[in-house]
Amino acid sequence: QDKPFWDPPIYPV
């Protein structure tokens, strides 16, 4: 759990 994840699986890479 390092990346902020919302309802849609969106990961700022």
UniProtKB/Swiss-Prot annotation:
The record's keywords, sorted A to Z, are: Amphibian defense peptide, Pyrrolidone carboxylic acid, Secreted
Pfam families with a match to the protein in the record: Tryp_FSAP (PF08248)
Q: In which tissues is it expressed?
A: Expressed by the skin glands.
List GO terms (cellular component aspect): extracellular region
Q: What is its main location?
A: secreted
Instruction: Give the Pyrrolidone carboxylic acid positions (modified residues).
Output: Q1
What InterPro entries does its record include?
Tryptophillin (IPR013266)
Q: So what family is this one in?
A: Belongs to the frog skin active peptide (FSAP) family. Tryptophillin subfamily.
Its protein name is Tryptophyllin-T3-3
Q: Which organism is it from?
A: Phasmahyla jandaia
High-level lineage: Eukaryota, Metazoa, Chordata, Craniata, Vertebrata
